């Protein structure tokens, strides 16, 4: 094929209950794009029924598409290789293979999640965004670093779309339930406290779902439960996006996926981005949910940059993670022009939770950490979170010293302003030391974490930004900390750290992580925690 000419690609999307066919050219012009959603006769989607729907609907959509763009003009066939439901993926792959063979044109299987990101970039002005991808089967925070889209944060159990749909089914709402939850939520006027679970840049939604169902069963107004479910879950999503933003220092945030159609979620992210002084993008609704055009576009990007497949390579991958894909279509020279998040001059740091300023307390150098109000959260929830975390942080900074772990000294706590003044530590954060190639302290990190875990303390936000290395290594930022003797809580603590290292220090990951594990192994309980860690990583479903 002559790749110097304008290529036309047809894309087949069928990872769950939506069947999509799209045609796009290499200029990024969408020539055809239509999606049909399978609506089950009873609540819940059966994978086999969804696959049967694809088999019938692809034929119909293909006829419509080829009435717009004749078959002889198609140069390339692309399809969603995964992740998704096995039966749906197999029907989609079979359809794409059949067309590819019949017209003797090349075929490319692409990652469904990354397709969302790339069509979003095409349809907005985003260049290098931190992407929140939210749908029925996926909840991820993605960032491009080191020739891969890295999963910076994600759900530890169910996806946000699934959470909303399951709640809607429980309340006898039609499918897809998220639309009806949003509709009811607009008329809610009472906030009901529900579980709010953030662990580093990950979230857990299963406890929230169960609690919301119980509130509905206890005869709370459905409008109030929907309002509270949305406010809680979307605040969690916005918070982990903000945490990832602080960790990666990206200057753009983009929202994609089916749940991106929710106006309240868009509003919350827009407010957060304004507070962080970064740009916010969301593609038009047609390109938020699953569609064939996004599959076709990623197929073109990969093909034009050397990706080739034969039929043996087209077996679907139901657990096809975004970070399994080697990105060959983003030029390295782009990195030189990428913008970074700008920290206000009067601050020495601006995290997801707090503004950090330097000063003096009596004769001592100090820093002040103020948990500022978050405009994206409703007042009741925001006050609760900021107060709880301020008190927690002060408590745990004192508690870890009793375990022989170094931490800043607290000078003053202002509960009204959610502000802590503490000693200034001369040193560098671990993130900077690793970037410089200094890894001598990494084993000490493992020992410190082991000492915390033996003492029954789980940090819940372990990143390389939360250790300060000087003559000794200090641990900071305990706002998410808790007491726990559960092996799984300690395993998740390590997983949070592992993912943060992989996302930023990918080129040094093995060296850094192995040193941390060696240090952690000096404690007796380490073996059971490390084994549990493997089990937790295996059972992650939403990819």
Curated annotation (Swiss-Prot):
InterPro entries: ATPase_NBD, Bud32, Gcp-like_dom, KAE1/TsaD, Kae1_archaea_euk, Kinase-like_dom_sf, RIO_dom, tRNA_threonyl_synthase/kinase
UniProt-listed SUPFAM superfamilies: Actin-like ATPase domain, Protein kinase-like (PK-like)
Residues at which L-threonylcarbamoyladenylate binds: 133-137, 165, 178, 182, 262
Record's cofactor remark: Binds 1 Fe(2+) ion per subunit.
The UniProt record lists the keyword Transmembrane helix: no
GO cellular component, one term: cytoplasm
GO biological process: tRNA threonylcarbamoyladenosine modification
Chain residues that bind ATP: 348-356, 369
Catalysed transformations (reactions): L-seryl-[protein] + ATP = O-phospho-L-seryl-[protein] + ADP + H(+); L-threonyl-[protein] + ATP = O-phospho-L-threonyl-[protein] + ADP + H(+); L-threonylcarbamoyladenylate + adenosine(37) in tRNA = N(6)-L-threonylcarbamoyladenosine(37) in tRNA + AMP + H(+)
Region called Kae1, residue ranges: 1-329
Main location: cytoplasm
Catalytic-site annotation from UniProt: 461 (proton acceptor)
Keywords for the protein's UniProt record, in alphabetical order: Acyltransferase, ATP-binding, Cytoplasm, Iron, Kinase, Metal-binding, Multifunctional enzyme, Nucleotide-binding, Serine/threonine-protein kinase, Transferase, tRNA processing
Cellular location(s): Cytoplasm
GO function terms (MF aspect): ATP binding; iron ion binding; metalloendopeptidase activity; N(6)-L-threonylcarbamoyladenine synthase activity; protein serine kinase activity; protein serine/threonine kinase activity; protein serine/threonine/tyrosine kinase activity; zinc ion binding
Residues that hold Fe cation according to the record: 112, 116, 133, 290
EC number: 2.3.1.234, 2.7.11.1
Residue ranges of domain Protein kinase in the record: 342-543
Record keyword Zinc present: no
Pfam family, one: TsaD
Function: Required for the formation of a threonylcarbamoyl group on adenosine at position 37 (t(6)A37) in tRNAs that read codons beginning with adenine. Is a component of the KEOPS complex that is probably involved in the transfer of the threonylcarbamoyl moiety of threonylcarbamoyl-AMP (TC-AMP) to the N6 group of A37. The Kae1 domain likely plays a direct catalytic role in this reaction. The Bud32 domain probably displays kinase activity that regulates Kae1 function.
PANTHER family (UniProt xref): TRNA N6-ADENOSINE THREONYLCARBAMOYLTRANSFERASE
Subunit field text: Component of the KEOPS complex that consists of Kae1, Bud32, Cgi121 and Pcc1; the whole complex dimerizes.
Protein family (similarity comment): In the N-terminal section; belongs to the KAE1 / TsaD family. In the C-terminal section; belongs to the protein kinase superfamily. Tyr protein kinase family. BUD32 subfamily.
Entry protein name: Probable bifunctional tRNA threonylcarbamoyladenosine biosynthesis protein
Organism of provenance: Methanococcus maripaludis (strain C6 / ATCC BAA-1332)
């Amino acid at each position: 094929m002559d790749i110097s000419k304008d290529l036309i690609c047809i894309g087949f999307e069928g990872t769950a209950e939506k069947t999509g066919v799209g045609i796009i050219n290499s200029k990024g012009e969408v020539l055809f794009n239509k999606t049909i959603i399978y609506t089950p006769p009873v609540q819940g989607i059966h994978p086999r029924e969804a696959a049967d729907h694809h088999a019938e609907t692809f034929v119909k959509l293909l006829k419509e598409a080829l009435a717009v763009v004749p078959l002889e003009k198609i140069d390339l066939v692309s399809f969603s290789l995964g992740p998704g439901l096995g039966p749906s993926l197999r029907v989609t792959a079979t359809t794409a293979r059949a067309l590819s063979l019949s017209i003797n044109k090349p075929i490319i299987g692409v990652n469904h999640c990354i397709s969302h990101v790339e069509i979003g970039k095409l349809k907005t002005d985003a260049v290098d965004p931190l992407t929140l991808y939210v749908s029925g089967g996926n909840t991820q925070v993605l960032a491009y670093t080191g020739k891969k889209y890295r999963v910076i944060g994600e759900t530890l159990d169910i996806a946000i779309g699934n959470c909303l749909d399951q709640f809607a089914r429980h309340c006898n709402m039609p499918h897809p339930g998220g639309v009806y939850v949003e509709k009811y939520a607009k008329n809610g006027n009472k906030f009901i406290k529900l579980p709010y679970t953030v662990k580093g840049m990950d979230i857990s939604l299963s406890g929230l779902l169960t609690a919301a169902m119980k509130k509905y069963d206890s005869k709370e107004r459905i409008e109030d439960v929907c309002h509270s479910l949305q406010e809680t879950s979307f605040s969690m999503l916005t918070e982990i996006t903000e945490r990832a933003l602080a960790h990666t220092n990206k200057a753009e945030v983009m929202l994609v996926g089916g749940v991106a159609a929710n106006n309240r979620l868009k509003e919350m992210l827009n407010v957060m981005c304004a507070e962080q002084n970064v740009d916010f993008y969301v593609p038009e609704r047609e390109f938020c949910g699953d569609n064939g055009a996004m599959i076709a576009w990623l197929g073109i990007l990969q093909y034009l940059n050397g990706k080739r497949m034969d039929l043996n390579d087209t077996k679907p991958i139901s657990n096809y993670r975004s970070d399994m894909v080697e990105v060959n279509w983003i030029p390295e020279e782009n990195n030189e022009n990428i913008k970074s998040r700008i920290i206000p001059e009067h601050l020495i740091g601006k995290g997801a939770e707090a503004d950090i300023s330097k000063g003096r307390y009596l004769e001592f150098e100090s820093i002040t950490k103020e948990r500022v109000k978050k405009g994206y959260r409703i007042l009741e929830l925001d006050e609760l979170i900021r107060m709880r975390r301020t008190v927690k942080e002060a408590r745990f900074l004192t508690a870890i010293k009793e375990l022989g772990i170094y931490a800043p000294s607290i000078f003053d706590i202002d509960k009204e302003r959610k502000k802590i003044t503490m000693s200034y530590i001369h040193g560098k954060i671990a993130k900077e030391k690793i970037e410089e190639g200094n890894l001598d302290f990494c084993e000490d990190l493992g020992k410190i974490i082991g000492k915390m875990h033996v003492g029954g303390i789980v940090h819940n936000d372990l990143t390389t930004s939360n250790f300060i290395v000087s003559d000794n290594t200090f641990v900071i930022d305990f706002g998410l900390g808790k007491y726990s003797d559960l092996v799984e809580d300690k395993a998740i603590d390590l997983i949070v750290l592992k993912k943060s290292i992989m996302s930023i220090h990918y080129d040094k990951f093995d060296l850094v992580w192995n040193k941390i594990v060696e240090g952690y192994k000096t404690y007796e309980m380490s073996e059971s925690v490390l084994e549990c860690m493997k089990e937790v990583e295996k059972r992650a479903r939403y990819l």
